């Protein structure tokens, strides 16, 4: 009888060797230096697209340079895990062995009828309009935002959600967005590495299913002048392997002190590394949307609301050095013990603050 002449071994799963010279890398590699490696990322689920097994992987050069976006993310997640776990073990909970950043992203998009899309060379070539006349009616009345989802779009959304569930992407919401023919979906939060992989996968699925419904999908941040563009807002936090959200206040002063510890360090990190945060989203397309045209501006700031601002003001009044017994008591009674357990709606959201 016949035998298979090809099989997929464990070694092939763990490591492969693609060409590392043709990949855009900003000059890290010379074009004649071709050897590179992909390595399996077992922390993100493999999945099947059609009949193809897709394996989340990192991509490095023969000499160790990072050639992808996943490797820096994994390094950052590991650094946060080590630092946060040390703090938890030393001061708050010795049972914590891992701290994972969690991420819930939003995906905004425009749908354009395929025939109309193909009649616009600027849309086809750049993903955005380069010239045109403002419409007689835009988003002034909010009638699209608060209106019903069109039937054709709803059919697209339903098929998209079914495909997402097949691939383990936990989408939960669908709705119209502000601009005409702009829409949004969002998932449940996940571990940050998995969430990023799922968002990349989702955009590929969205474009493929849009084609089936005779739509073309636009992900450009500012495809049309005069109406809102598409943002990708991120809801971010830190979670322990014991089930705690470290950026959520607790029921007692000790838990609130734990929250304040991570809260002030997050603000310090935003202050110290604002340039890196800004650089991470400083694409040409995003700069069309930010600052001059839409909130938020290019200046990195953090809006925390009047309640938490008051808490930090009280903390600043404590004298330098060791706390006196009176200060310890006053701090516990006046600040740490009084943060409400749930901060839901304690403060508005400030659209002029990129980190809010």
Per-region residue spans from a language model:
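Glycine-rich, acidic/polar active-site loops that bind/position phosphate-bearing ligands
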Residues: 1-219, 224-356
């Amino acid at each position: 009888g016949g035998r298979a002449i090809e099989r997929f071994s464990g070694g092939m799963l763990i490591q492969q060797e693609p060409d590392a010279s043709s990949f855009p890398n900003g000059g890290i590699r010379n074009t004649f230096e071709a050897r590179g490696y992909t390595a399996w990322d077992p922390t993100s689920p493999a999945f099947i697209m059609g009949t193809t097994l897709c394996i989340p992987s990192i991509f490095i050069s023969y000499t160790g340079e990072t050639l992808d976006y996943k490797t820096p993310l994994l390094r950052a997640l590991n650094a946060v895990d080590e630092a946060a776990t040390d703090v938890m073990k030393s001061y708050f909970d010795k049972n914590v062995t891992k701290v994972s950043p969690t991420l819930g992203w939003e995906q905004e998009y425009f749908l354009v009828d395929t025939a109309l899309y193909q009649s616009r060379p600027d849309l086809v070539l750049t993903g955005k309009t380069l010239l045109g006349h403002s419409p007689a009616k835009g988003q002034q009345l909010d009638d699209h935002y608060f209106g019903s989802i069109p039937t054709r779009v709803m059919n697209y959304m339903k098929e998209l959600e079914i495909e997402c569930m097949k691939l383990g992407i936990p989408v939960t919401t669908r709705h119209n967005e502000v601009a005409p023919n702009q829409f949004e979906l969002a998932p449940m939060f996940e571990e940050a590495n998995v969430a990023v992989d799922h968002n990349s996968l989702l955009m590929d699925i969205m474009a493929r299913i849009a084609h089936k419904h005779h739509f073309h999908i636009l992900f450009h941040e500012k495809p049309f002048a005069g109406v809102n563009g598409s943002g990708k807002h991120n809801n971010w936090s830190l979670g322990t392997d014991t089930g705690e959200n470290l950026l959520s206040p607790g029921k007692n002063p000790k838990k609130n002190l734990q929250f304040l510890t991570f809260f002030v360090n997050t603000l310090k990190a935003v202050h110290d590394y604002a340039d890196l945060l800004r650089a991470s989203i400083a694409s040409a397309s995003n700069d069309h949307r930010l600052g001059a045209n839409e909130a938020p501006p290019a200046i990195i700031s953090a809006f925390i609301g009047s309640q938490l601002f008051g808490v930090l003001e009280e903390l600043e009044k404590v004298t330098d050095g060791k706390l006196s017994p009176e200060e310890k008591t006053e701090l516990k009674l006046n600040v740490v013990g009084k943060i409400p357990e749930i901060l839901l709606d304690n403060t508005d959201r400030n659209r002029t603050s990129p980190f809010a």
